[in-house]
């Protein structure tokens, strides 16, 4: 029978060096809170319960997680006094099952991988396992001291290390997998008899060794998995490290970046082969790119699906839209939520489309607003066409059937329908339905005054 798994996330720190009114764990990395990264990762495992220890800004932290992770059963425990990591875990004991095991994680160490946590859990065969790392410069970090047989016997802090111990390059990450029975046994015994007068979680290691427990240690695949965030410089550095990892994975899948250091992925991005991404492009949420997609500079693409062989020109914003194959977009186009562009359609410069469907091969080339509309196949929408969809209270639909032609600078006042192969003359204001194959115009008749003289200054 598999042992039950609890996750304890320590998220009580203020993050004074961030100089922010927002709790440190709510600072964002790749478009997601630091705490959100930890929750998403650990819940790729089979987790029975999650306990989050909160402190400074606890209401903000709870509100954020309740909104973003309402589907997760989370137990909240307050650490009213910041008395060290050992104390932070100790306050969870009233909520922690007596059996099973717990992963102890940190809300400001966001990039530990699911694979690493699974390996750490599997390594816990005698009551405790821990995540360590061998580094070139261990100064200031707790060293892992081993006996002559290679077993862990203690964690030595920098200030307590002798000259030999200071040469040790294996350091403690602070991430553990521990049997709950041992946590219930050891944590009440922690002492704050030290210079900082804090309760150190690392003290449970020497307690376990004294009980004859063999502590397993594993190392993560990447150094950044154990990097914490204490200030904005560290946050920015970790952001670039993570972006580099995301970009490298996409390059291996066949995506070409004009400059891998000048793109941001703030969510998940999957892409087909022979995709090109120019500089300054930002992806947010869940984005999917087909094969041979070409994205030029400065575009923002959020929660969108882009079909094969699409060309997105500079400075387009695409938000929660679905784009078919062979579509041309932009430059400076704005696709708002619930927009669908069918295959081989075209949306040109300074066009805004909201909650509308553009049919196969249809074109909205210049300076138009299309909202709450259904446009058929082979339709041409001229420059400056506006669908007037809002009367101040209600939104109404505009329907344009196949092969219609809408002349430039026309206003279509919804609700209205333009029939199949109908033509709307340029400059018209259309307030009534237009029959199929008809020509409709609604504008003042042109008059002309010959020999007209302009006013002159007196």
UniProtKB/Swiss-Prot annotation:
GO terms for cellular component: cytoplasm; membrane. Its cofactor is Mg(2+). Residues 1-232 are annotated as: Pyrophosphorylase. Acetyl-CoA binds at residues 383, 389-390, 408, 426, 443. Gene3D superfamilies: Hexapeptide repeat proteins (2.160.10.10), Spore Coat Polysaccharide Biosynthesis Protein SpsA, Chain A (3.90.550.10). Mg(2+) binds at residues 108, 230. One of its GO terms (biological process) is lipid A biosynthetic process. Pfam families: Hexapep (PF00132), Hexapep_2 (PF14602), NTP_transf_3 (PF12804). Pathway: Nucleotide-sugar biosynthesis; UDP-N-acetyl-alpha-D-glucosamine biosynthesis; N-acetyl-alpha-D-glucosamine 1-phosphate from alpha-D-glucosamine 6-phosphate (route II): step 2/2; Nucleotide-sugar biosynthesis; UDP-N-acetyl-alpha-D-glucosamine biosynthesis; UDP-N-acetyl-alpha-D-glucosamine from N-acetyl-alpha-D-glucosamine 1-phosphate: step 1/1; Bacterial outer membrane biogenesis; LPS lipid A biosynthesis. Keywords: Acyltransferase, Cell shape, Cell wall biogenesis/degradation, Cytoplasm, Magnesium, Metal-binding, Multifunctional enzyme, Nucleotidyltransferase, Peptidoglycan synthesis, Repeat, Transferase. It is found in: Cytoplasm. Catalyzes the last two sequential reactions in the de novo biosynthetic pathway for UDP-N-acetylglucosamine (UDP-GlcNAc). The C-terminal domain catalyzes the transfer of acetyl group from acetyl coenzyme A to glucosamine-1-phosphate (GlcN-1-P) to produce N-acetylglucosamine-1-phosphate (GlcNAc-1-P), which is converted into UDP-GlcNAc by the transfer of uridine 5-monophosphate (from uridine 5-triphosphate), a reaction catalyzed by the N-terminal domain. Homotrimer. In the N-terminal section; belongs to the N-acetylglucosamine-1-phosphate uridyltransferase family. In the C-terminal section; belongs to the transferase hexapeptide repeat family. This is Bifunctional protein GlmU. It comes from Psychrobacter cryohalolentis (strain ATCC BAA-1226 / DSM 17306 / VKM B-2378 / K5). The lineage of its organism: Bacteria, Pseudomonadati, Pseudomonadota, Gammaproteobacteria, Moraxellales.
